[in-house]
Amino acid sequence: GLMSTLKGAATNAAVTLLNKLQCKLTGTC
């Protein structure tokens, strides 16, 4: 449903942000 779609999009966005942050902080890309 719509809620699971939104939840999935939010999760993907959060994971992407965390990956970028980790990349900058640790230098492991």
Curated annotation (Swiss-Prot):
<comment type="function">
    <text>Antimicrobial peptide.</text>
</comment>
<dbReference type="GO" id="GO:0042742">
    <property type="term" value="P:defense response to bacterium"/>
</dbReference>
<protein>
    <recommendedName>
        <fullName>Brevinin-2Rb</fullName>
    </recommendedName>
</protein>
<feature type="disulfide bond">
    <location>
        <begin position="23"/>
        <end position="29"/>
    </location>
</feature>
<keyword id="KW-0964">Secreted</keyword>
<dbReference type="InterPro" id="IPR012521">
    <property type="entry name" value="Antimicrobial_frog_2"/>
</dbReference>
<dbReference type="GO" id="GO:0005576">
    <property type="term" value="C:extracellular region"/>
</dbReference>
<keyword id="KW-1015">Disulfide bond</keyword>
<comment type="similarity">
    <text>Belongs to the frog skin active peptide (FSAP) family. Brevinin subfamily.</text>
</comment>
<dbReference type="Pfam" id="PF08023">
    <property type="entry name" value="Antimicrobial_2"/>
</dbReference>
<keyword id="KW-0878">Amphibian defense peptide</keyword>
<keyword id="KW-0044">Antibiotic</keyword>
<keyword id="KW-0929">Antimicrobial</keyword>
